[in-house]
Amino acid sequence: MAHDMHSGDTERRILDSARRLFAEKGYEKTSIQDILNDLGLSKGGLYHHFKSKEAILDRLNADEWAVTARLLDKLIEHKDMSALEKLRVLIVSAVDAPDHLDLVRSQLALLKDPAFFTANMRFWSTRLPESFRSLIDMGVQDGSIPTAYPEEAAQLLSLLGNYWLMPCFYPADHAGMEHRIRCLATMLDAIGVPVFDETLILRTAEGLTALTPEEDTVSA
């Protein structure tokens, strides 16, 4: 048991170091040796956990996905909520939960790295839409999401929500962010996915505006 705990600690240290170095130097410019030097770890110690730098990057992305997957599993089990309500809870968890926002904030600099950005785009275009699609399909069945475009709606939420709404890509002040979210809400309403009510619009604008990098802050 003690060995397992130590092994887990080492793995977490590797991930924390890699996340920081990838953000500071860029993924391509960070070598395995840089991570080893930062931790004072042997090659064998690192390769016991991760076979390559790419494996570390994949794990960093998987960790974020795991948080969403756990919440999705819990939501699906709830029988006293409509699918539309569950979808709103899932979105709130992404834009209003301090732990998740801290994780996103820690990775913003990494998104400037082409390799990390590409890995995230793969996630946003494949696995994340699957999460939204499962709830949208449930909404079609229970009548709370009367859409004829479940696949397209899942893709819109995933790609626009994680790219177009992100202030690190498209800077905006609070008013500009709220206006943008209302635009997305209008698009989704038009295809029968009325997920963004007034409360969710305001909470989403608040959470995403807080992610604006200081150097990119837009003056009102």
Spans of features found by a protein language model:
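Hydrophobic alpha-helical connector segments
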Residues: R59, D63, R70-V104, A154-L157
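Short secondary-structure transition hinges
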Residues: D96-S144
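C-terminal peripheral helix-coil segments that are non-catalytic and often amphipathic
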Residues: M1, E130, S134-Q141, D173-A220
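Short coil/turn segments at alpha/beta junctions that flank glycine-rich nucleotide-binding fingerprints
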Residues: E24-E28, K79, D142
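All-alpha amphipathic helical-bundle segments outside canonical DNA-binding/catalytic cores
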Residues: L84-E85, F123-W124, D137-L156, H174-H179
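Helix-turn-helix
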Residues: A2, R13, L21-R59, D63
